[in-house]
């Protein structure tokens, strides 16, 4: 933190770059830890024991990871696919229907959301609508913390479902939560049913960011990102009234959107 006191009125104001505050993200689960743990226990029974994502050696394969940003260039994706015939396309649930609509069948779709399939997503869409059209060629990579209603829907529709474990503090015992990880090993709560030595995939709090960790775990090092839009030129008047925060947990509502500045240096 920087504190600057100007006692001479003839001095110029401090540069704007010194007034900027870096964006600091404190990730947290979107549902209570108990809810996530219950999801894991249920999915360990639903998912095939032999179809879990595990660590692969590094290879020269290429991959495309598609998030759900509004400025996704589908023509560029197709150009890459035509140039590299064996390239793999991994997407998130929100980009899955739009990819199909644009004639692109994803090799995989990564799913992480621990909330019910009947609920409304962060994009304002009922989650079940995102899985209305399902292509048998897509591998649906379902995190063990995913709500079982999603897993059951995919299984009922004869989808090719694979499981994976997303690392979160919810997997650890209360006394170990928040503690620094040593020797790249964590102790998982026994009651969750996750096998010892299971692959845990790290990354951000959304499926798109975990997708990078997923592809890295699968041995990919040449990854092309699409749809990772996190900014807009100007929020609408309606969006400016939107707030975020755990109100039930006692937090104060905060603006959902805020202005950021990107330094060119």
What feature does the model see in each segment?
Residues 1-265:
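Metal-ion/cofactor- or nucleotide/acyl-coenzyme-handling active-site neighborhoods
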């Amino acid at each position: 933190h920087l504190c600057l006191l100007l006692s001479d009125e003839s001095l110029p104001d401090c540069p704007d770059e010194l007034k900027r505050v870096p964006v600091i993200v404190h990730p947290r689960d979107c549902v209570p830890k108990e809810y996530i743990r219950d999801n894991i226990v249920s999915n360990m029974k639903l998912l095939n024991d032999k179809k879990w994502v595990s660590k692969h050696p590094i290879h020269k394969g290429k991959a495309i990871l598609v998030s759900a940003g509004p400025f996704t260039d589908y023509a560029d994706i197709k150009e890459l696919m035509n140039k590299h015939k064996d390239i793999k396309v991994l997407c998130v649930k929100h980009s899955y229907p739009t990819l199909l609509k644009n004639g692109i069948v994803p090799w995989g779709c990564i799913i992480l959301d621990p909330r019910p399939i009947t609920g409304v997503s962060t994009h304002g869409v009922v989650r079940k609508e995102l899985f209305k059209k399902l292509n048998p060629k897509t591998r649906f990579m379902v995190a063990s913390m995913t709500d079982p209603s999603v897993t059951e829907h995919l299984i009922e529709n004869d989808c090719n479902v694979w499981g994976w474990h997303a690392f979160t503090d919810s997997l650890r015992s209360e006394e170990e939560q928040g503690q620094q990880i040593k020797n790249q090993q964590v102790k998982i709560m026994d009651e969750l049913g996750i096998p010892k030595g299971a692959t845990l995939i790290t990354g951000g709090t959304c499926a798109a960011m975990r997708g990078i960790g997923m592809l890295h775990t699968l041995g990919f090092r040449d990854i092309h990102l699409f749809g990772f839009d996190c900014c807009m030129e100007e929020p609408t008047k309606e969006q400016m009234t939107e707030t975020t925060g755990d109100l039930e947990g006692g937090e104060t509502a905060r603006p959902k959107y805020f202005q950021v500045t990107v330094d060119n240096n």
